[in-house]
Amino acid sequence: MHYLRYFAIAFLLLLSSCSVTRHKPLIEGSTTTIPNTPSSNFINGSIFQQDNSLYYGYQPLFEDRRPKNIGDILTVLLQENVSASKSSSSNASRKSNANLEMNALPKIINKIIGNDQLSTDINSNNGFNGKGGSSAANTFSGTITVTVIDILTNGNLKVIGEKKISINQGTESIRFYGIVNPKTIDHNNQVMSNLISDSKIEYIGDGYINEVQKMNWLQRLFLNYFPF
C-alpha cells in the first residue's frame, strides 16, 4: 500500500516536471562583442595609416559618424507590419436517376409479386459545399541599439543586440539580429528594420504574467491525446 502511494507521488512529480515548456530561443549566442585590441604597427609619419593601427576606431572630421568597425553601435527603428489573409471555397454536386421496367415476367416470378410487370426506380443525389478562410496581422514598433559583430567582404555589417526591461515581477526581453547595408544608415546613426536583411526579432518575457498565459500539463494532455 505504501509503495502504491509513493508511486503515485512520483508519477505526479513526473507530470509536473513535464508541464514546464522549454522555450527555444530564436537568436542564440552572445548579443554583444568586444573589438580586438589593435596591433601596434610602425608609424611612418604619413597622414593615412594602415588598418588596425593605433588609429583604429577614429572618426573622420568631415564624414558622418557611421559604424564601420566591429564593436560599433547603431540604432534600429523597429517598424514591422505584416498582414496576410487567405480564403477558399469549393462545391460539388452529383445527381443520377435509374429506371428499370420489365413487362414480361416468368410465371414463377409473376406468382410471387402478383403483377404482370416489374418496375424499379433508383435515385441518387450527392452534394458537397466547403468554405475556409484565415487571416493574420502582426505589428511591432520600438527602438533597439545593436552592436556590429562582423563585417562581411562586401562591407555589410552583421549586427546583434538585446534590450531587457524589468517591470515589477516580470522581465521583457527584445533581441535583434540582421545584416545592415551601411548605405541605409542615416546621419543620426539609425536604420529602419525593414531595410535590414535576414532580420530576426524575438520578444519574450518571464514572470507570473507570462506564466498565466501558458496551458498547464493536464490541459495539454487532453488537447493532444483526447480523441473527442
From Swiss-Prot:
Lineage of the species this protein comes from: Bacteria, Pseudomonadati, Pseudomonadota, Gammaproteobacteria, Enterobacterales
Signal peptide as annotated in the record: 1-17
Keyword Lipoprotein in record: yes
Residues bearing a lipid moiety (N-palmitoyl cysteine): 18
HAMAP family in alphabetical order: FlgH
Protein name, entry field: Flagellar L-ring protein
Organism of provenance: Wigglesworthia glossinidia brevipalpis
Domain of life (superkingdom): Bacteria
GO cellular component, one term: bacterial-type flagellum basal body, distal rod, L ring
Gene Ontology annotations of biological process type: bacterial-type flagellum-dependent cell motility
Cited Pfam families: FlgH
Family per record: Belongs to the FlgH family.
Function of the molecule: Assembles around the rod to form the L-ring and probably protects the motor/basal body from shearing forces during rotation.
Protein encoded by which gene: flgH
Subunit and interaction comment: The basal body constitutes a major portion of the flagellar organelle and consists of four rings (L,P,S, and M) mounted on a central rod.
Location relative to the cell: Cell membrane; Bacterial flagellum basal body
Membrane topology of this protein: Lipid-anchor
Keywords annotated in UniProt: Bacterial flagellum, Cell membrane, Lipoprotein, Membrane, Palmitate, Signal
S-diacylglycerol cysteine lipid attachment residues: 18
Major location category of this protein: membrane
GO MF terms, alphabetically ordered: cytoskeletal motor activity
